[in-house]
Swiss-Prot record:
It comes from the Bacteria. This is Uncharacterized protein YpbS. InterPro entries: DUF2533.
Length: 85
């Protein structure tokens, strides 16, 4: 019985670490999006490279099954968002 308990605890801990990593990446992604939006709004040059690098990391975590995937972001998506603000 204790081996089963240890296995369940280890699995639960691993899932918790995935969720924490996902949340950290989600915060980083939101900051990168805010930066791109601010630059777009001010007609400054910007890229979505940082956003999409973080998104790729998030999607790698999602392949392990416990966290959702996120869409890659294009410059056009940023422009459309800014135009609706």
């Amino acid at each position: 019985m204790s081996e089963v308990h240890k296995a369940i605890s280890a699995h639960s801990s691993k899932q918790h670490e995935h969720i924490k990593a996902f949340m950290r990446l989600e915060n980083m992604r939101e900051l990168a999006i805010e930066e791109a939006v601010a630059k777009c709004r001010n007609d400054e040059p910007y890229t979505t490279d940082a956003i999409n690098e973080i998104t790729e990391q998030m999607n790698q975590l999602a392949k392990k099954g416990i966290v959702p995937t996120r869409r890659l972001v294009s410059k056009e998506m940023v422009r459309e968002y800014v135009s609706r603000m």
